């Protein structure tokens, strides 16, 4: 549930990266270009050997926090370690090969203020193939409601959750 006194809650965005340079610039740009601006990026460099760090450093934004691990850790463990570094009221995950629509955070935060009983909100998502072809994964016809947290986690839809 959203804190009723917080008009502009901080959203902690976790990005776990292991050699994710290929689409990293587009992914981070989609976060920087959000209409909702009160976010922090916890960039968890999971022992990358490519130019991921150099791509990240092209963005000089005080909201970006860089952490490097000296040993590779499984994704679930890396995410849990990154969660410990967050300071936001909300947590979301953005993978290095994902892009967010510009109003994603704004619309999700608005939903929390409209319904004080919400614990989680999520979005539809698309797969992009070679940046041109798209395939919609979830349609409005079968979006679950009610007690949905476990359903979302069971179907690996963590990228759309806030």
Predicted regions and their residues:
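N-proximal low-complexity "stem/linker" segments adjacent to membrane-targeting elements
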Residues: 1-32
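Conserved nucleotide-sugar donor-binding catalytic segment
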Residues: 13, 75-76, 84, 123, ...
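A structural helix-start
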Residues: 17-25, 45, 49, 53, ...
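Short alpha-helix within the catalytic core of nucleotide-sugar-dependent glycosyltransferases
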Residues: 25-29, 53-54, 88, 101-113
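A conserved acidic beta->alpha catalytic loop
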Residues: 30, 45-54, 71, 95
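Conserved donor nucleotide-binding strand/loop of the catalytic core
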Residues: 53-87, 99
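Short aromatic/hydrophobic "clamp" motif used to bind/position activated sugar donors
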Residues: 91
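Conserved donor NDP-sugar-binding/catalytic core segment of glycosyltransferases
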Residues: 103-136
């Amino acid at each position: 549930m959203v804190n009723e006194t917080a008009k502009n809650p901080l959203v902690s965005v976790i990005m776990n990266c292991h050699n994710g340079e290929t689409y990293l610039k587009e992914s981070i740009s989609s976060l920087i270009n959000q209409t909702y601006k009160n976010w922090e990026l916890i960039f968890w460099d999971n022992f990358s050997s490519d130019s991921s760090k150099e791509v990240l450093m092209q963005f000089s934004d005080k909201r970006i926090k860089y952490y490097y691990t000296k040993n590779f850790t499984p994704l679930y463990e890396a995410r849990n370690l990154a969660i410990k570094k967050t300071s936001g009221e909300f947590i979301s995950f953005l993978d290095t090969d994902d892009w967010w629509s510009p109003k994603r955070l704004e619309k999700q935060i608005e939903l929390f203020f409209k319904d004080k009983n919400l614990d989680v909100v999520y979005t539809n998502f698309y797969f992009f193939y070679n940046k041109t072809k798209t395939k919609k994964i979830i349609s409005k016809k079968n979006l679950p409601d009610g007690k949905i947290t476990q359903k979302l986690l069971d179907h690996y839809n963590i990228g759309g959750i806030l």
